A protein has these predicted regions:
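Substrate-binding pocket helix/loop in short-chain dehydrogenase/reductase
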Residues: 97-98, 105-110, 218
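Active-site helix of classical SDR
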Residues: 121, 157, 165
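Alpha-helical segment proximal to the catalytic Tyr-Lys
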Residues: 126, 170-171, 246
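Short C-terminal tail/terminal secondary-structure segment
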Residues: 146, 237-238, 244, 249-264
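Short, small/polar-rich loop/turn modules that mediate ligand/substrate recognition or access, typified
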Residues: 173, 178, 248-250
Length: 264
């Protein structure tokens, strides 16, 4: 299927690993001009080189910036003033008991996971409306619907992203601009894979055994019964970014492996 993304300018934040990297690679495969972002120039170079190696026709540029700050967001907008597609993917997570989540933790998670997308959307959405075409996607999580007790601060930010995406979509009424959120389920990103591997080692079991036990005990509602691969999420995001997805607007698109049981 041709997703009609040839020549579209796309910024994927937090691009150097996991879901963000997979999205950037998929958009590059579809012919989009992709802007790669991370906090350090070294990681941007590494990600760009890897995508170029895997996608022969990739058209990439990199912008290192810390999007957890207003200054970092301003830097990106200054270096890339025009976008067709904005994928707000950058994010952090950390399992932590509620009693031990400090004020600084709450503020950091909100700054990185929520305000990065707010600031960039505020910068790019007006011009998208003026040109009567654009795509903004927030990479939220099933944790935004089913708040994990072990990561309440993380779940809060994912719920906020869903709300912001819906609210921004309401402002695009009658235009060809769409704003959506995509809700991955448990995904085998590098960070999650390392986390799972460490826990499996601590519990003296294989990674495969731990994965089985994880879905049995921690995510029993999963229909998929395995970790989702980053490229599977990227496939969904690429379609949502496509002109073919013009009827999808204000939606919380689930790619959660069936973890969320509710229909609505």
């Amino acid at each position: 299927m041709n997703l009609e993304l040839e020549g579209k300018i796309a910024l994927v934040t937090g691009t150097t690993a996991g879901i963000g990297f997979a999205i950037a690679r998929r958009l590059a495969c579809e012919g989009a001009d992709v802007i790669v972002n991370s906090r350090t120039e070294e990681r941007v170079r590494e990600a760009t080189a890897k995508i170029n190696k895997e996608v022969s026709k990739a058209n990439l540029r990199g912008i290192p910036a810390d999007l957890g700050t207003a200054e970092g967001c301003e830097q990106v907008v200054g270096e890339a003033p025009r976008l067709d597609i904005l994928v707000n993917n950058v994010g952090i997570f950390e399992p932590k008991p509620f009693e031990k989540i400090t004020d600084a933790d709450w503020e950091k998670f909100f700054a990185v996971n929520v305000m990065s997308g707010v600031r960039l959307s505020r910068a790019y959405l007006p011009a998208m409306k003026q040109r009567n075409w654009g795509r903004i996607v927030f990479i939220s999580s099933e944790s935004g619907l089913q708040i994990p007790a072990e990561m309440i601060h993380y779940g809060m930010t994912k719920t906020a992203q869903i709300a912001i995406a819906r609210g921004l979509a309401e402002t695009c009424e009658g235009t060809n601009v769409t704003v959506n959120s995509v809700l991955p389920g448990p995904t085998a990103s590098e960070g999650v894979t390392e986390f799972v591997s460490n826990l499996a080692t601590q519990q003296k079991m294989s990674a495969a055994k731990f994965e089985k036990e994880f879905f049995k005990n921690a995510r029993p509602s999963s229909i998929l019964k395995r970790f989702i691969e980053p490229h599977e999420i990227a496939n969904v995001v690429a379609f949502v970014c496509s002109p073919l997805a013009s009827a999808i607007n204000g939606a919380a698109v689930r790619a959660d492996g069936g973890v969320v049981r509710s229909i609505g």
